[in-house]
């Protein structure tokens, strides 16, 4: 099915490599979190939500791995230990939920004080406007926390894009290469999976979504990872959102 023939009720967008450049995430957001995590923790160490995040970080399997790398066993859980662990997780690009939550809080400060602006590709705002005008819902599914997602779109280079978005999902619904995650999203949206179009740059995510009954298209944005020949088969590949500007909701045959 070509882009011009597709119909859907919901467009589910990935962020990194889909609406937003991978370089923004890896070259701007991740370094900002690494540079500011220690100060952020020192300033907020006694706050209840930070205490919960610190407790959750100590429960993830990678925490034991990190402690094993240290010159000696830590005598206490303090800012230096947790900040070092968070920097380790960022360097390893590990999708650990409490770390993502903490990153979101750090980025919130950066957006609030004007040090950060969310990157979106130039075709994204026009596509969002066209889809909403056609009656479609737009939802987001990213490994970044919901709070971080809202910051990128709420403080984007194109202004506040949150009014276009009706739902946000992160790893609390499951990991992005697991079929069940997309079934969970469809259930929460109260929508037939086949009426949801998922846009991503990762073939494994597209395959998981399709196995759950969703439609899926792969984005080939500049800077995205090159696709092997076997990854290109079976999926429509598009360079940006422009081929989908005419996306429509399905016609109710009883009204046609």
From Swiss-Prot:
GO cellular component, one term: cytoplasm
EC number: 3.1.3.77
Compartment annotation: Cytoplasm; Nucleus
InterPro entries hit by this protein: Enolase-ppase_E1, ENOPH1_eukaryotes, HAD-like_sf, HAD-SF_hydro_IA, HAD_sf
Pathway(s) per entry: Amino-acid biosynthesis; L-methionine biosynthesis via salvage pathway; L-methionine from S-methyl-5-thio-alpha-D-ribose 1-phosphate: step 3/6; Amino-acid biosynthesis; L-methionine biosynthesis via salvage pathway; L-methionine from S-methyl-5-thio-alpha-D-ribose 1-phosphate: step 4/6
Binding positions for substrate per the UniProt entry: 142-143, 176
Enzymatic reactions: 5-methylsulfanyl-2,3-dioxopentyl phosphate + H2O = 1,2-dihydroxy-5-(methylsulfanyl)pent-1-en-3-one + phosphate
Pfam families xref list: Hydrolase
GO function term, MF aspect, one: magnesium ion binding
Entry annotated with the keyword Magnesium: yes
Binding site for Mg(2+): 14, 16, 201
Enzyme kind, highest EC tier: hydrolase
Cofactor(s) required for function per UniProt: Mg(2+)
CDD domains named among the record's database cross-references: HAD_EP
GO biological process: L-methionine salvage from methylthioadenosine
Alphabetical UniProt keywords: Amino-acid biosynthesis, Cytoplasm, Hydrolase, Magnesium, Metal-binding, Methionine biosynthesis, Nucleus
Cofactor, free-text remark: Binds 1 Mg(2+) ion per subunit.
HAMAP family named in the record: Salvage_MtnC, Salvage_MtnC_euk
Protein family per UniProt: Belongs to the HAD-like hydrolase superfamily. MasA/MtnC family.
Subunit structure: Monomer.
NCBIfam families: enolase-ppase, HAD-SF-IA-v1
PANTHER family, A to Z: ENOLASE-PHOSPHATASE E1
Function: Bifunctional enzyme that catalyzes the enolization of 2,3-diketo-5-methylthiopentyl-1-phosphate (DK-MTP-1-P) into the intermediate 2-hydroxy-3-keto-5-methylthiopentenyl-1-phosphate (HK-MTPenyl-1-P), which is then dephosphorylated to form the acireductone 1,2-dihydroxy-3-keto-5-methylthiopentene (DHK-MTPene).
Protein name: Enolase-phosphatase E1
Gene label: Enoph
């Amino acid at each position: 099915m070509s882009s011009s023939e597709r119909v859907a009720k919901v467009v589910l967008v990935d962020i990194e490599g889909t609406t937003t450049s991978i370089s923004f995430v890896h070259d701007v957001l991740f370094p900002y979190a690494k540079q500011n995590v220690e100060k952020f923790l020192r300033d907020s160490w006694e706050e209840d939500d930070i205490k919960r995040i610190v407790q959750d970080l100590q429960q993830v399997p990678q925490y034991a791995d990190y402690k094993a790398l240290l010159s000696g066993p830590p005598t206490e859980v303090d800012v230096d230990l947790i900040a070092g662990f968070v920097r380790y997780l960022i360097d390893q690009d590990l999708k650990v939920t409490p770390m993502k939550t903490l990153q979101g809080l750090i980025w919130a400060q950066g957006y609030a004080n004007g040090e950060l602006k969310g990157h979106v590709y130039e075709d994204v705002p026009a596509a969002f406007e066209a889809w909403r005008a056609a009656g479609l819902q737009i939802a987001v599914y990213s490994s970044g926390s919901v709070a971080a997602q809202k910051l990128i779109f709420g403080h984007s280079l194109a202004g506040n894009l949150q009014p276009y978005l009706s739902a946000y999902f992160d790893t609390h619904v499951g990991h992005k290469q697991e079929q069940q995650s997309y079934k969970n999203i469809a259930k929460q949206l109260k929508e037939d999976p086949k009426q949801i179009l998922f846009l991503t740059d990762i073939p494994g995510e597209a395959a998981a979504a399709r196995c759950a009954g969703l439609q899926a298209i792969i984005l080939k944005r500049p800077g995205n990872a090159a696709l092997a020949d076997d990854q290109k088969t079976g999926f429509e590949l598009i360079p940006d959102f422009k081929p989908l500007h005419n996306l429509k909701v399905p016609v109710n045959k009883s009204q046609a």
